[in-house]
Regions:
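A detector of single, family-specific signature residues
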Residues: 1-361
């Protein structure tokens, strides 16, 4: 059977046809990532091999392979999507260390011809949608974290004593006060009862009037910068507005993600320490777990498998994680593993066992 290797690019792809014996048929084709370009690929194949059966191979390069994969899948073709590391390994076997799109598409076809490869596939539509939302949520969380850091930088300059009043600068009570008053001068001049009402409301009656008094005293005695107050307060107002907007986005995202998660018969969230969103993220990244031949394959997919360093009789005992798999899955696993280690569960017991064996956190 003929093999069509496709080197994936953002605006153009490159295709090469290889015979079952490993001979390239004709020259490679460069085609645009459009309907017209995909049609030219079909014409190119027919011109070179007619209606002979063929399969396709391509690398999982970012998200750029999705459209051509969908196009070919709709036409009933078999498509093998491989990890770029696999074709890179074959490239290193060639004497000429050349890399261009034409050679890459040929090498991708060769990987498929040799048959020594693992495949990636387009996920179920609901899994794909949930994965997109979870990854987008991750980027929104990162943006919010950056804003929190910038708020902290401003407060360290204009009111360095303020953060010590709370467990964290950006807790609800703290942000409620800053949103209303912005500067230490405004806090100092605020009526005590008005300030306390904000504190009482945002803390759900957990904090007393003593906290309002303490904050006002700190504002009156602050060692913060006194100049350019208007510029600092303007920045602070914009940053708080942006953070409030992102909070609303995250809330809406969570609702969307949970709608998809509830479509699956998944019980990850029943494990103590794993929340619904974390469970959805893990499920979205793994997809159909049956596509992994073993637990080791799943561990490698997450990139938490240890690297192996051996030479002759030497074997390293200080190996690190490969970090070659999905960074989103790896991050989610790290977070839930940390949380689970604090809960009374079998995972906590296993964590303590490993710590007792001398393993680091």
């Amino acid at each position: 059977m003929y093999i069509v290797g496709i080197d994936i690019g953002k605006n153009h792809h490159e295709a090469s046809i290889v015979s079952p014996e490993g001979k390239q048929i004709g020259r490679s084709l460069r085609f645009a990532t459009t309907h017209k370009g995909a049609d030219s690929l079909m014409s190119f194949i027919f011109k070179n091999i007619g209606n002979s059966p063929c399969v396709f191979g391509m690398e999982a390069t970012g998200h750029y392979w999705y459209p051509i994969y969908s196009f070919l899948k709709a036409k009933g073709y078999t498509i093998y999507v491989i990890n770029p590391i696999q074709s890179d390994s074959l490239r290193k076997m060639y004497i000429r260390q050349t890399k261009n799109d034409s050679i890459d598409s040929f090498l991708i076809a060769e990987v498929i011809r040799f048959g020594q490869f693992g495949t990636t596939s387009m996920a179920d539509e609901n899994i794909l949608a949930m994965r997109q939302l979870c990854r987008y949520r991750d980027s929104v969380i990162s943006s919010r974290t950056e804003i929190k850091l910038r708020i902290g930088t401003i407060m360290e300059q204009i009111f360095p004593e303020y953060e010590k009043q709370f467990s964290s600068l950006c807790v609800s009570t703290s942000m409620g006060i800053l949103e209303k008053y912005l500067t230490p001068e405004n806090i100092e001049n605020a009526p005590i009862d008005e300030l306390f009402e904000i504190i009482k409301d945002k803390s759900h009656n957990r904090l007393t009037k003593a906290k309002a008094i303490s904050i006002k005293e700190a504002a009156a005695d602050t060692f913060g910068i006194k100049i350019a107050q208007d510029a600092f307060s303007f920045q602070l107002k914009q940053l708080i507005d942006r953070m409030n907007f992102l909070d609303k986005q995250i809330e809406a995202l969570d609702c969307q993600i949970l709608e998809y998660y509830e479509k699956f018969d998944c019980y990850l969230h029943t494990i103590p320490g794993i929340g619904m969103i974390a469970a959805a993220t893990i499920l979205a990244e793994i997809g159909d777990i049956n596509r992994f031949k073993s637990s080791s394959a799943l561990v490698a997919f997450a990139g938490i498998d240890p690297t192996v360093r051996q030479s002759g009789e030497f074997s390293s005992t200080h190996n690190h994680m490969s970090k070659r798999g999905s960074p989103y899955l790896r991050h989610a696993i790290f977070l839930v593993a940390t949380t689970c280690s604090f809960h009374n569960s079998p995972l906590n017991a296993y964590y303590k066992k490993k710590r007792d064996q001398g393993k680091h956190h």
